[in-house]
Amino acid sequence: DIVKILDIANSNLLALNPSDIPMGEIEGHEFVRGFFDPAITRLTKLHEEDDWQSFVTLNPDSSRKRFYLDIYTRPGARTLAPSLDLALELARKHDPGYRLWLGVQSNDFAYKSLLENHGFTILRKYWTLEMKLPVENESSSPSLGVIRELDLDKEDDLRTFHEVHQDAFSQHFGFMPRQFNEWSEIVIRDKDETNMQAWLISVNGVPAGFVDFNDEQLHNDSGYVSGLGVMQAFQGKGLGEALLRHAIQINSELGRSKLCLSVDAGNESGALRLYEKVGMKPISEWHQYEDL
């Protein structure tokens, strides 16, 4: 089924935006497995004799009482509306009290119109940014802090990572804290399944920020920065840039030809300015909708 899912998803993505990054096997498995709790997935078609036309992945997050919904449809297929109806029915059956967040490419006007007709409103905008590697990378000043790789097989490092991560994102839109046990299970899973690496920056021996990246986009010969954050008390001191430049350096040394990440367009921490400063450029825009 992963092959079918990727075929549907990439035909959808690239028809809407040929510059977008095609989905790879790791992402396909994530959509089937689930981001947090087990996913609810369906392939849909109008007639028995048809090929599969749409893929629905409904990802529950029980700790946040929230669903994340993605629907991919082959260009020209007429399965989008019935697939959305099916997803809404599955969500209600699972838990009618959950909020529903849906991701849509910014130029998928048919899907956006369908959502708005169902009473959904746009909640947030996100950009995917990418840069070419290798680049002439400015080295960060040692006075900014010391960067070391976290050993995700050690509980002490996991607890340090958890503390820094939760504090760094505590003021971000939609953030809700996760307890260590639940959070660490997700991190260990991502280490094993996506080859995630995490790096910590400390100032005078005090943990201050982190960056993590993985092989999710390896099929595109690209590294993927899945997380970058600086604790509230250390923001505005250049630590985020030092961490990002470290990620650029490591991915260049790994032989990747590109590096990409996603950013909340409404992020007030100056993240977008930082990414553009190091040479990243937007290649796609996504809109997140919410049911009211």
Label each PLM-derived region with a short phrase.
Residues 111-115, 271, 275-276, 280:
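Conserved active-site tyrosine of GNAT-family acetyltransferases
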Residues 60-63, 73-145, 287-292:
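Acyl-donor-binding surface of acyltransferase catalytic domains
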Residues 171-216, 228:
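Phosphate-binding active sites in nucleotide-utilizing proteins
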Residues 100-103, 225, 259-263:
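Conserved hydrophobic beta-strand within the GNAT/NAT acetyltransferase core sheet
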Residues 76-90, 230, 236-249, 253, ...:
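Conserved acetyl-CoA-binding loop-helix of GNAT-fold acetyltransferases
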Residues 244, 267-271, 288-292:
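Short glycine/proline-centered loop/turn elements that form peptide/ligand docking sites
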